[in-house]
């Protein structure tokens, strides 16, 4: 999983 802000 990836979370980009």
UniProtKB/Swiss-Prot annotation:
Record's miscellaneous remark: The dextran produced by Leuconostoc mesenteroides CMG713 has a molecular mass of about 2000 kDa and contains exclusively alpha-(1->6) glycosidic linkages in the main chain.
Keywords from the UniProt entry: Glycosyltransferase, Transferase
Coiled coil: none
Main function: Involved in the production of dextran, an extracellular glucan polymer.
Signal peptide boundaries: none
A single MF term (Gene Ontology): dextransucrase activity
UniProt EC number: 2.4.1.5
Protein name: Dextransucrase 2
Reaction it catalyzes: [(1->6)-alpha-D-glucosyl](n) + sucrose = [(1->6)-alpha-D-glucosyl](n+1) + D-fructose
Enzyme class: transferase
Membership in a protein family: Belongs to the glycosyl hydrolase 70 family.
């Amino acid at each position: 999983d990836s979370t980009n802000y």
